[in-house]
Amino acid sequence: MTQMPQTNARVHAGRMAYHAGLSAEASVIREYESHGYVFEAQRWRGQVGEIDLVLRKSGLVVFVEVKKSKSFERAALRISPTQKRRIFATGEEFVAQEPQGLLTDMRFDVALVDAAGAVQILENALSEG
């Protein structure tokens, strides 16, 4: 049985989004590394969800949610309250494996990537409030 054209288009769009996401994440990793951070994990998956990037610097664990869109503003709007809760829970799951557990120094950032590939990092951008 052959796929319907609409299904093929959806599969193609999904593949394009996947590769665009990988490219955006690679740009963000380079940006952090240029500021002395050490890359640890990409698309780290826990039981609750996934964290796009995990980096370290001087004992600090940084969890990064990467959002790509036509503009920084549009990218920033793509983070829902449900997604924030999932990111926090997944980050807590990650640090539970650390020697200091939940006492580990950690930060939750958002990295925005626009259509031109420019990167804007918003440190500590996710708040539980």
UniProtKB/Swiss-Prot annotation:
Coiled coil: none annotated. Belongs to the UPF0102 family. One of its GO terms (molecular function) is nucleic acid binding. This is UPF0102 protein RD1_1191. It comes from Roseobacter denitrificans (strain ATCC 33942 / OCh 114) (Erythrobacter sp. (strain OCh 114)). It comes from the Bacteria.
